[in-house]
Amino acid sequence: MKPFALSALVGAALLVGCAAKPLPIKHDQSYVLEWIGERPLIDNSHLTMTLGADGRAYGNAGCNHWFASYTLQDETITFGAVGSTRKMCAPALMEQEQRFLQAVGKVQHWDISPIDQLRLWPAQGKPLRFWEEG
């Protein structure tokens, strides 16, 4: 019985070690947004985010291009002031874009979900949920 208990203990320790190590955010990888908080994106809209290794974030906000500085340390991520180009689109796309840009400014930490989705979390509420593009 002792060898079994020792094997079980070692196996459990290995699993805990694996579970505690989060997958990293990939720099210079484009991510495609699927949800803004509690709402999915409008059909056929394409919102993206790339986190450059130089500390600059950028992408497509659905209508306009967006950009911001960001700081990443462990599971904490914060964005500086978010800017964008100023093209006009359909009102529903403009509203979605504003929700996205406001949500980016409220992000405080990140994680990778059990289904390998990048989630950017505000202090309160539901996350922005992204898939790796391509």
Please report, for each region that a protein language model flagged, where it lies by residue.
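Lipid interaction determinants
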Residues: S7, C18-G134
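Sec-dependent bacterial lipoprotein signal peptides
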Residues: M1-V16
